[in-house]
């Protein structure tokens, strides 16, 4: 999509930078949320005018200028989506078609969650899962796992082998190591 954004910003002679600089680690961030759902997440950043007008090291920065840049970038996105429609649809179809393969390679086959310990948070989690079409099942019989008892009717199991397997991993896993040392500091952010 970058060429489409670039063309629209070139048309208004606006300066821009069109490269990928940072990986997306936190799935609660807008541009990353699409990535985990088979979409293409895009982050636009620009200097804020903080008001109608402010001084910057490159001169006056106005609110109207900021809005114009965002508007033109949005038109660039529309241009690109129209031109690349079939590519985006194919990408998303393949993303979900590979879900079973991705799930089979995951060592974790499901998440067992006790609803009794913090019922309100657990209910909020279940609602979030339902909004994302993630299946969670009531525990049919009481079990003990690693010395912890999970009672029938007071726990759920979330299998990872379902179309939203990547999202399940994204919200349940706690990532504490990163391959790249250069990133926005979101290392303490997590959805669980």
Predicted regions and their residues:
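Intrinsic-disorder/low-complexity accessory segments
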Residues: 1-16, 20-26, 30-192
């Amino acid at each position: 999509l970058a060429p489409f954004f670039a063309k629209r910003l070139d048309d208004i002679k606006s300066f821009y930078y069109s490269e990928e600089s940072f990986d997306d680690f936190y799935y609660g961030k807008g541009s990353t949320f699409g990535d985990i759902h088979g979409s293409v997440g895009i982050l636009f950043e620009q200097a804020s005018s903080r008001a109608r007008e402010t001084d910057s090291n490159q001169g006056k920065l106005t609110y109207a200028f900021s809005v114009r840049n965002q508007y033109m970038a949005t038109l660039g996105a529309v241009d690109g989506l129209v031109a690349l429609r079939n590519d985006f649809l194919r990408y998303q179809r393949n993303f979900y078609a590979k879900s079973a393969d991705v799930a089979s390679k995951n060592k974790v086959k499901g998440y067992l969650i006790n609803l009794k310990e913090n019922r309100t948070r657990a209910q909020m989690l279940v609602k979030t899962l339902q909004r994302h079409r993630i299946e969670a099942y009531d525990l049919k019989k009481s079990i003990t796992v690693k010395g912890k008892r999970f009672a029938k009717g007071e726990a759920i199991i979330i299998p990872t082998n379902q179309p939203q397997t990547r999202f399940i991993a994204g919200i349940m896993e706690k990532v504490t190591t990163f391959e790249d040392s250069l990133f926005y500091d979101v290392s303490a952010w997590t959805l669980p």
